[in-house]
């Protein structure tokens, strides 16, 4: 089946969406919060017969609107109720087969009900409005003391990667907001792991417009996906704090504190945290899935402050400052199957890596709007960081699968056996000690002037950046070849002992002018010109100690910044070991111009943007390396067309189609005709004949929502194809296991990613809910492979197919939540040249969770899931892991501000951590050490002070840090305390200890 047929099948499947059926007669209206004069969402609305028998029911949407079906003409009673407010009944007459609009109905606060009401209806899990997905936090139970990361993990369509990256409905989240205000800009991870879930009422996911589009009012299509956490009503007044202190067995601990202060137009939030559970406590996995792969043991500390001010007229500013410290202990067991023509190449590597880092990050945004025609925005930022690293690894390369001989490929017995068989290619041991010190600063200034009220604008933007980095590296490499003999007929040995000093400096500046001209009703022509200048200098000094002989530094114990321990053994002054050939000086200057012409049409129902960007570039590159002096000038020209179309079927249903083409120029190092053999196992060769690559990207996104049963659905489709992709031609030497890599242009690379999400409540009160999320990933990688310099070049194609499905059925009321869930992930890898190595792997997960909450403040949560893997080379990885977590919590004092909880993670000691990566060159499976089974005893305390008086509300919601809500009369939280511990918990052994060295 060719690519076009595959794409057609996927498109047809994605676009076969559920139709929306219309009601013949409806009773509709709008609900208003009497105290706050705002729309009242998620209230229970029931239509009763004249004898008070139930006819139909629903809940109001985010705008307070509701609509119910009236089966026939007659008299009805409209009953509206909401927790904390007085229930109202309204007589309704439906006649003549016509819809009935009852207008605005106002509900008033009821203090008595607020204290004693039992919630009958449940807030809808997700509501769609325009292009915004709004998740109601009260509909998702998370464990006591959880941060918003645990909440996001259980949202439909959400994915959190191993590196902490967040995806919502297939799009990566770039920024976190709180109540629409910027929060810890530039670091989504800090916000996710420190913002308490207990203060959150709603989570919105949407595409935020660029600064330029927001101030000009003209959509430029340059959005970034954001998560906007809305705080509970009443929480944005006065002062509140949350403190969580946890101690556990095996030396585990996790401490976290948060305080917030609000006064008039000013808000300030501060955070402190320290833990050695890998930042993975309180929400390790997601329902029906495997969760994140935990990589190593990490001790982290963080302190941060975030401030916002908005006087509502002319001034706004946001500022954040954070400090992060990390100590890492990562052990990785790696097995690689390299796709090297008809020749097999397997590599087994075990590495132990220690890291530590300190970093400071400060950011600020100032916006001044003196009148309706002017807008000025200034964004400065500063980052400081220091880091240390220590890496010790042992590896071996084989021409046959070592697991066919035994379970320990790096064991002495198996290595000796494979050497005797002639299938052991090489064996090496590496030690690397690194240090880095980096300072960087950026600033941008944007000035916009509206020339008229109909969209005529002129904008000027200035930006600059500066970076100063200093790095040191000491490395030893001992490599023995078993199929490559030296002059004496013995196994050949290669050694490299080197010390590198690498200072790097760079700076840049840019200026941009944009002009928008209305040419018709809601139609604009936009012209932009940008000039950027960048300069980067690097001067690496390399000292080579090869002449000292093998094993010269064996007596040195590697440690952080242990340069003196190595250098003290030198027989001559350090300068006498300087190697001019291996040292490298480079200087790179670029002058880039961007010229953009766009037409933008912003109609009521649809928006259309189309345009082209032209990018001429002039570059000057100088380099001294490997005895070759380079001084070259290069001119290039790129272009990028864009088409963006959006159609709004209704406020809850939208379609977006997007296309962009973009060119990518090869780097200077790829173009230089230089052979770099400083690493004999990975030799790189330049290619002066490289042409630029051109990537075509097509995106489709559609969402819909139906108020009855609170049904929402979403589908997305992303496709990218690269013409003249810059790939690699690899020549493999079977006798040494070395690769010579040369960049080449190659066609045939593409990827497709698509998904469908559907969420619905089965009943009108939202007690029963079903969610399904299906994804398809197709990838095609092309490369060129050669057995030797004399053999023919073979074209290799690797196709990868990944299918996944997650399904969840849940029941919830005010004191109980039960969920059954499951997922399946299928991965098929097919290699053109090594069909015998094609693999089909499966990952299954299924189980359930139960959360019970007693009215006296006790909550009990447990979940049990079976995780299974099949199809891996290493039989030990084809396992069944039964993961059981449990938590019990008790809240105390008036308003339940004090909570004591016990969490048990991976009670059965079966959690493991494995990741797989497939690309054009091969397939790699990696198993990491991790924090597995442990227990934590946690004490949480919450203090609220609103309007100068401590608040201890009696209304409760869900199991976060205990009950929390705003002052009487506001919308109270919906749901009880309680929650579940993470499904895929951390676990593992205590830290192995970090090497010594000077402190920061």
Write out the residue ranges for each language-model feature:
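A short, solvent-exposed loop/turn motif at the edges and junctions
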Residues: 48-54, 75-90
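Periplasmic plug
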Residues: 128, 165-213, 226-231, 266
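Structural motif
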Residues: 30-40
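Short, polar/charged loop or turn motifs at beta-strand boundaries
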Residues: 132-154, 167-168, 178-183, 244-249, ...
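Short, surface-exposed beta-strand/beta-hairpin micro-motifs centered on an aromatic residue
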Residues: 61-70, 165, 191
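Primarily recognizes Gram-negative and organellar outer-membrane beta-barrels
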Residues: 186, 209-251, 265-1000
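Short, acidic, small-residue-rich periplasmic hinge/interaction motif at the N-terminus
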Residues: 32, 46-48, 81-85, 95, ...
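Short, acidic Ser/Thr/Gly-rich low-complexity loop/linker segments typical of extracellular
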Residues: 50-65
